[in-house]
Amino acid sequence: VTDRIEKIKAFLKDNPSDCFLNHALALEYVKAGDEADARAHFELNMNNDPTYVATYYHLGKLLERVGEQEQAIAVYEKGMERAKAAKDMHSYNELQAAYEDLAY
């Protein structure tokens, strides 16, 4: 995992706001158990490109794992709004299922 993290970080030096690379890096940090860095990169993605819908599901799941249910619910709600606006019903349904599992 560490080797992949280093490779992605090297790519990010050229384009630090690349959503795909930041998302990939966040997922690698999740695999490595580094939730603080994973969260930082998911949140960076949300700030850089709020329409990058994949971020919402994974950040929500991370927040659930660290016991921040209210924040996870808010992230799922925002993600559902974004997915609906993008007409991305697959992502919307995934976010809605995660939201309902947590909220009800």
Residue ranges of each PLM-predicted region?
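Canonical positions in the second alpha-helix
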Residues: 10-11, 44-45, 79
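TPR/TPR-like (Sel1-like) alpha-helical repeat modules
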Residues: 69-88, 100
